[in-house]
């Protein structure tokens, strides 16, 4: 059976009080609507149509070709929004799910179960519901004496007795696609909001003797909609708990989950330890037996087995096995550290390749460079890579020793087994097995201060 999805993403989100389009506000480093799209695609649908309105181009820019789009010029209600997908879906057979773009916590597993329940019951429509303690603002599930769905009533149209019901509609539905578009043309806007409500389609189906099912989820967090910054914060916290819980169940030690933020696309190997205050985002891959020290930040990077990152920032970089970074080091984009490398305190590495066993232990800047195997870079060494217009490369061979407070003025190549004396400013290439000294000879005037 063919399956389709409609994501409702046309709302202005005035309560967010933001210039940014509502569904593009981020949860766990990713726009809300992107979380929804990934869950929808993961549920196995064949085609997705996203309904966009204000800020349409920005949504398209994020989702790209993963979705088709329909434009809703006026926001006249959820039924009106779904009807905008008519040109893409009206003649399709199969099941269509409707999901709100501001429900970033919905999972593909719940959508798969909703679709299966809907199709197994041979229903024309199925609503995803939940029972919550504070149902204010949600449509209520009104059941008849036999427990079947009678209707869904919106908050502003509900009687007091209906407002006391704590089973609510999530705003997520599964429909027989043909039935959906047939009934949408019959929906009226005679309600307190003057809008065309999608739940009215369910009433029309029931009035014709059709089958409408309710599938209740026990995970209330999944259906949480985000309408303001407070709810955005709640969604962020919920996603954080979910992600950390997943990693801990898969063998990762997280010392303080409440202060640890791990993005949804991060992978972490077993027996890795994450200390308090850590942030790991983007498409970061962390191996086994790694230690990420407190207050470190890692983005879009690869950390191999046995490495240790202490109170450092790592962006778009790679760290080899058993390598030690920090404390207070910064790996900028393009930093590539081999195995058993040491990058110590107050060292900055940018677009540089440090081969296995290389050491840069203190107070150095290494940029646009290659440092050979087992080479030691002394405290205060600087690669002078920029002339105000262009960047130039520094190459240091293997098994070399660069003393403290050395300037390597690029472009320059230092060979293998070279000793560069402390305090030197090196402007010329140095061949293998050499000593390079480039500093003024010391003059001492005895008795000068008497």
Swiss-Prot record:
- Specify where the region named N-acetyltransferase lies, as residue ranges: 251-450
Positions of Mg(2+) binding: 102, 227
Database matches in Pfam families: Hexapep, NTP_transferase
Where do the segments described as Linker lie?
A: 230-250
Q: Which domain of life is it from?
A: Bacteria
Pathway field: Nucleotide-sugar biosynthesis; UDP-N-acetyl-alpha-D-glucosamine biosynthesis; N-acetyl-alpha-D-glucosamine 1-phosphate from alpha-D-glucosamine 6-phosphate (route II): step 2/2; Nucleotide-sugar biosynthesis; UDP-N-acetyl-alpha-D-glucosamine biosynthesis; UDP-N-acetyl-alpha-D-glucosamine from N-acetyl-alpha-D-glucosamine 1-phosphate: step 1/1; Bacterial outer membrane biogenesis; LPS lipid A biosynthesis
Q: Which cofactor does it need?
A: Mg(2+)
GO MF term set = glucosamine-1-phosphate N-acetyltransferase activity; magnesium ion binding; UDP-N-acetylglucosamine diphosphorylase activity
Q: Transmembrane region positions?
A: none
Q: Which CDD domains match?
A: GT2_GlmU_N_bac, LbH_GlmU_C
Q: Where does acetyl-CoA bind?
A: 385-386, 422, 439
Sorted UniProt keywords:
Acyltransferase, Cell shape, Cell wall biogenesis/degradation, Cytoplasm, Magnesium, Metal-binding, Multifunctional enzyme, Nucleotidyltransferase, Peptidoglycan synthesis, Repeat, Transferase
Subcellular localization, as worded in the UniProt entry: Cytoplasm
Region Pyrophosphorylase: start-end pairs = 1-229
**Annotated positions binding UDP-N-acetyl-alpha-D-glucosamine:** 8-11, 22, 72, 77-78, 139, 154, 227, 332, 350, 365, 376
Protein purpose: Catalyzes the last two sequential reactions in the de novo biosynthetic pathway for UDP-N-acetylglucosamine (UDP-GlcNAc). The C-terminal domain catalyzes the transfer of acetyl group from acetyl coenzyme A to glucosamine-1-phosphate (GlcN-1-P) to produce N-acetylglucosamine-1-phosphate (GlcNAc-1-P), which is converted into UDP-GlcNAc by the transfer of uridine 5-monophosphate (from uridine 5-triphosphate), a reaction catalyzed by the N-terminal domain.
State the NCBIfam families in the record: glmU, PRK14354.1
Quaternary structure?
Answer: Homotrimer.
Similarity remark: In the N-terminal section; belongs to the N-acetylglucosamine-1-phosphate uridyltransferase family.
Q: What is this protein called?
A: Bifunctional protein GlmU
- Species: Staphylococcus aureus (strain NCTC 8325 / PS 47)
């Amino acid at each position: 059976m063919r399956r389709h999805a409609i994501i409702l993403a046309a709302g202005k989100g005035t309560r967010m009080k933001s210039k940014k389009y509502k569904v593009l506000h981020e949860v766990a480093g990713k726009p809300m609507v992107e979380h929804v799209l990934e869950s929808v695609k993961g549920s196995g649908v064949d085609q997705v149509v996203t309904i966009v309105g204000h800020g349409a181009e920005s949504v398209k820019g994020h989702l790209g070709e993963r979705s088709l789009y329909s434009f809703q010029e006026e926001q006249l209600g959820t039924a009106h929004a779904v009807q905008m997908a008519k040109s893409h879906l009206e003649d399709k057979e199969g099941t269509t799910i409707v999901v709100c773009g501001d429900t970033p916590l919905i999972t593909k597993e719940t959508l798969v179960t909703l679709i299966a329940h809907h199709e197994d019951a041979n229903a024309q429509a199925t609503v995803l519901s939940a029972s919550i303690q504070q149902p204010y603002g949600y449509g209520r599930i009104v059941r008849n004496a036999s427990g079947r769905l009678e209707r869904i009533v919106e908050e502003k149209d509900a009687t007091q007795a209906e407002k006391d019901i704590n089973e609510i509609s999530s705003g997520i539905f599964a429909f027989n696609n043909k039935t959906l578009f047939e009934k949408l043309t019959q929906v009226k806007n005679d309600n307190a909001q003057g809008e065309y409500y999608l739940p009215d389609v369910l009433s029309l189906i029931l009035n014709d003797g059709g089958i409408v099912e309710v599938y209740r989820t026990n995970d209330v967090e999944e259906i949480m909609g985000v309408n303001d910054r407070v709810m955005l914060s709640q969604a962020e916290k919920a996603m954080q708990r979910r992600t950390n819980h997943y990693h801990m169940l898969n063998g990762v030690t997280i010392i303080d989950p409440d202060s640890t933020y791990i993005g949804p696309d991060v992978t972490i190997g077993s027996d890795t330890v994450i200390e308090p205050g850590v942030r790991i985002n983007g498409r970061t891959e962390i191996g086994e037996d790694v230690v990420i020290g407190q207050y470190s930040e890692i983005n879009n990077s690869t950390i191999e087995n046995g490495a240790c990152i202490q109170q450092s920032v790592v962006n778009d970089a790679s760290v080899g096995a058993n390598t030690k970074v920090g404390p207070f080091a910064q790996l900028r984009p393009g930093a590539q550290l081999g195995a058993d490398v040491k990058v110590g305190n107050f060292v900055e590495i940018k677009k540089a390749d440090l081969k296995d066993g290389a050491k840069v232990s203190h107070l150095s800047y290494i940029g646009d460079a290659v440092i050979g195997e087992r080479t030691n870079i002394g405290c205060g060494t600087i690669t002078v890579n920029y002339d105000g217009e262009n960047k130039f490369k520094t190459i240091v061979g293997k098994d070399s020793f660069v003393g403290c407070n050395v300037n390597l003025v690029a472009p320059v190549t230092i060979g293998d087994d070279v000793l560069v004396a402390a305090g030197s400013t090196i402007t010329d290439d140095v061949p293998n097995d050499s000593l390079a000294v480039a500093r003024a000879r010391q003059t001492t005037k005895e008795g000068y201060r008497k």
